[in-house]
A protein has these predicted regions:
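Membrane interfacial helix-start segments of signal peptides and signal-anchor transmembrane helices
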Residues: 16-39
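Intrinsic-disorder/low-complexity signature in envelope-associated proteins
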Residues: 2, 6, 10-12, 45-161, ...
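An alpha-helical repeat/solenoid feature that recognizes helix-turn-helix modules
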Residues: 131-172, 186-218, 231-284, 288-433, ...
């Protein structure tokens, strides 16, 4: 026998409703649980799937605070991975405070420019006619970026009369300079701004920038040293006393190097605090120091004459300033035209250009005058052609003799490769191998005892290096593309 309780219809209905509510609650709880699990997984997995975008921080210098210039000192630290100077960028940290700010630069590809060379009619067609485009070295002016890949350098060497040995000698020299750099970034026991400027130009001539694996730290410290010299002296890039004759040489050479460094750094998005400020101050000092004649003399004194040994460095510096974009073109071109007016007066009937107005005094400076004409759009002028004719007859190069003075041939090599043709081929055959075989085993050159020549091994090494870079360096101020 069994007993069964009979439920009322109302109780049965309540039971069914309770079951329905329980089912709905179970579904809702399950959905919420799945959603919660998905959110937790997303928190942990999402960061690994999203590429982090670096925050770029740059330094904004205070141009109005003049009272701190003497005490202000720029500091730098770098962190770079192995790379070639022409193929990839590394991270550079630049700051003037105790907390460095980072300027990351992406890796870029470098395009190879044209390899056409001169036809003997002043300028070769391969000297570029405008700024590059794109990132990295593509932004470098066309007349400068051809030095920025090893493949292009070797191709230019072959096209213009160089050899692979020239490239090897340059690298050996740059390594010697790296070893001899002082802890403060300078070189030399005296006239350090000039000696540092020479070295920096040699590095930049090989496209060694703060990004370079082997020489990046060396270049960075050299730039910072020159910036600090300028900050301490209101834009005067010199360690010599203002009353000395030497400081104007230092200033021209140092300004030339800083301006070219600024062009590279600005195009590569490398920010050195106060580099622009010091470059502008230094360039303005050259413009203001130009005499009524168009020339420059010791101490930038007022003059109706000109000291061409001093003036040539100012003219080269102003052309480098032109490429920075920090001035209006008209201001710099006006100064350049005035300088050429003086050189026209100083040039002799035979094409020679000497120390001052007397073309017969130190006519070895003729190459510098020709280079200045070429820099400021007068490479096809009668004056430039006359100077080239003089050089073609008076540019022997016998190491150990006075005619091999590297100070003069630094100019001759640039002037004659710009001109191109047979004149360049003949001259190149005179100096190239002589220079190569007289490099010391440590990478340096010594030309002591040569009258009016390099004052020390450092200067001789820098000038010789710049001569061997002439095949691909293409100074910012040379070539048809600099107009």
């Amino acid at each position: 026998m069994s007993l069964h309780a009979q439920l009322s219809p109302e109780a049965i209905e309540r039971l069914h409703k309770q079951r329905r509510n329980s089912t709905i609650s179970s579904i809702v709880i399950a959905f919420l649980s799945i959603t919660l699990v998905a959110l937790v997984l997303g928190v942990f997995l999402l960061p690994s799937l999203v590429k982090e975008v670096p925050t770029i921080v740059t330094y904004e210098s205070n141009l109005d605070n003049d009272n701190e210039l003497v005490e202000k000192k720029v500091q730098v630290s770098t962190n770079r991975k192995p790379s070639s100077p022409s193929s990839s960028m590394s991270k550079v940290i630049v700051s003037n405070t105790s907390s460095p700010t980072s300027v990351p630069v992406p890796e870029v590809d470098v395009t190879n420019p044209s390899l056409d060379f001169g036809d003997g009619d002043d300028f070769g067609s391969g000297w570029g006619d405008g700024d590059g485009t794109g990132g990295g070295f593509g932004n470098i002016p066309a007349t400068m970026k051809k030095r920025c890949s090893k493949e292009d350098r070797l191709a230019r060497l072959q096209e213009t009369g160089g050899t692979p040995e020239c490239e090897e000698a340059v690298v050996k020299a740059l390594r010697w300079l790296k070893k001899t750099q002082k802890s403060d970034g300078s070189w030399g026991g005296s006239n350090q701004a000039a000696m540092t400027g020479f070295a920096l130009l040699a590095y930049l001539g090989h496209c060694e920038t703060p990004h370079s694996e082997e020489f990046g730290d060396t270049v960075t410290r050299a730039i910072l040293y020159l910036i600090n010299v300028g900050l301490k002296n209101d834009g005067r890039i010199a360690t010599s006393a203002p009353a000395s004759n030497h400081w104007v040489y230092e200033h021209g050479i140092g300004t030339y190097a800083l301006a070219e460094a600024y062009t590279f750094c600005s195009k590569l998005n490398i920010n050195f605090p106060d580099l622009d400020k010091v470059t502008i101050q230094a360039g303005d000092m050259i413009i203001q120091g130009q005499g009524e004649s168009g020339g420059w003399v010791y101490c930038f004194a007022s003059t109706n004459s000109g000291d061409n040994s001093v003036g040539f460095w100012q003219i080269q510096a102003l052309k480098a300033c032109y490429h920075t974009g920090l001035w209006t073109d008209s201001k710099l071109k006006k100064s350049g035209r005035k300088a050429l007016e003086w050189l026209e007066k100083a040039q002799g009937a035979n094409g020679a250009i000497g120390y001052r107005g007397n073309s017969g005094q130190s006519p070895g400076l003729t190459g510098g005058g020709v280079l200045c004409f070429q820099m400021w759009d007068a490479g096809r002028s009668r004056n430039a052609r006359s100077g080239v004719k003089y050089l073609s007859k008076n540019s022997d190069f016998n190491w150990g003799e006075e005619n091999a003075n590297l100070y003069y041939h630094y100019y001759n090599a640039q002037a004659l490769i710009n001109h191109g043709g047979v004149d360049w081929e003949v001259y190149n055959a005179k100096f190239r191998d002589e220079l190569l075989k007289n490099q010391a085993g440590d990478g340096s050159w010594n030309q002591s005892g040569v009258k009016h020549g390099p004052v020390n091994n450092h200067m001789a090494t820098c000038l010789a290096t710049l001569m061997l870079e002439v095949y691909y360096r293409f100074l910012p101020g040379t070539g048809a593309g600099t107009k």
